[in-house]
């Protein structure tokens, strides 16, 4: 009986391995062409982005695309955030490569999240727990790669005064090099949104943004427009929230005042909890955002196959990436009050 059980388990393992191998090969052999993986651009309604290619059923978040539209970065998490890394896809002769782990983000001892590209596409910023000596895991710091001759350089730690002994998250950079990011306020220990100006090639002492940006009971992962005209803020504990965390937007005037935050509405926010990573494409046409909203499709009769299919599909309760036209930002701007 033991031998029979062992034999059955062996056959099952071989079958599963074969299926996974075939799936991997078929995914790699799929030819994907066109802008944004050949996806139909969204209008006023949010669409799931690249289902089966980027939005797969795993936890996906943090989207960035180069100005020429030929390189895409995003993040995947697994094992309840035990593993988190950045994936990369490149288009050559109009054919996209299958998304793979970015070459500098392969060490399972570290986390790599929140990729962000400078407006000119020459610098890639991201968060990692890696350390300079690679001896142990450190705090989350901002790292940066520079593009030279079409290739990305080894990442370097951005250093002080932006990085400190505490954790930093979600870098977002303007045309003039100003960097916005999340960092604990030393006075309150609350995660808050800071910015540091770049002057003569050196970052200045970070300043905490005011109460129209640091909103709610918690706020983090703010995306700032390249021209610094608006900032998108995921915030928790707001009185008009649709769910646990919603996306809000604040607009900036010529005197560096920020408007009262505006909830970005039910087209973007939902009653689900995890909505805390947004970005706008470098061409300014599309807003990308993370959400764990569920799909509306019924499974029908429950079975091993239907549950496995649901588990391995987007809109299953893990986070996915959505996109929508940035025309919605113009509509929200009309609601801004200073």
What would you call each of these model-derived segments?
Residues 1-5:
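Positively charged n-region of N-terminal signal peptides that target proteins for export
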Residues 6-14:
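Sec-dependent N-terminal signal peptides
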Residues 17-18:
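C-terminal motif of bacterial Sec signal peptides marking the signal peptidase cleavage site
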Residues 21-338:
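Short, conserved micro-motifs composed of acidic
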């Amino acid at each position: 009986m033991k031998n029979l059980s062992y034999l059955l388990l062996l056959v099952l393992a071989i079958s599963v391995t074969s299926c996974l191998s075939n799936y991997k090969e078929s995914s790699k052999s799929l030819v994907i062409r066109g802008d944004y993986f050949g996806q139909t651009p969204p209008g006023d309604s949010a669409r799931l982005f690249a289902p089966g290619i980027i939005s797969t059923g795993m936890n996906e978040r943090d989207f960035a695309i180069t100005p020429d539209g030929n390189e895409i970065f995003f993040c995947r998490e697994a094992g309840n955030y035990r593993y988190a890394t950045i994936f990369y896809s490149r288009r050559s002769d109009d054919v996209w490569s299958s998304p793979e782990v970015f070459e500098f983000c392969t060490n399972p001892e570290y986390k790599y999240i929140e990729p962000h590209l400078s407006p000119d596409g020459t610098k890639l910023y991201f968060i990692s727990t890696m350390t300079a000596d690679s001896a142990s895991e450190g705090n989350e710091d901002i790292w940066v790669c520079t593009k030279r001759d079409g290739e990305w350089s080894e990442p370097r730690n951005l250093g002080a005064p932006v990085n400190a002994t505490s954790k930093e998250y979600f870098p977002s950079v303007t045309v003039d090099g100003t960097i916005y990011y999340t960092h604990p306020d030393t006075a309150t220990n609350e995660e808050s949104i800071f910015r540091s100006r770049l002057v003569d090639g050196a970052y200045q002492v970070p300043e905490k943004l005011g109460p129209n940006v640091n909103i709610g009971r918690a706020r983090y992962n703010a995306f700032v427009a390249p021209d610094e005209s608006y900032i998108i803020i995921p915030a928790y504990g707001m009185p008009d929230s649709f769910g646990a965390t919603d996306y809000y937007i604040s607009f900036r005037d010529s005197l560096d005042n920020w408007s009262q935050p505006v909830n970005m509405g039910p087209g973007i926010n939902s009653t689900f909890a995890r909505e805390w990573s947004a970005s706008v494409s470098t061409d300014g046409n599309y807003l990308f955002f993370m959400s764990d909203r569920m799909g509306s499709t019924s499974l029908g009769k429950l079975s091993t196959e239907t549950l496995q299919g649901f588990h391995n599909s987007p809109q299953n309760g893990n986070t996915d990436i959505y996109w929508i036209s940035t025309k919605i930002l113009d509509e929200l701007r009309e609601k801004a009050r200073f």
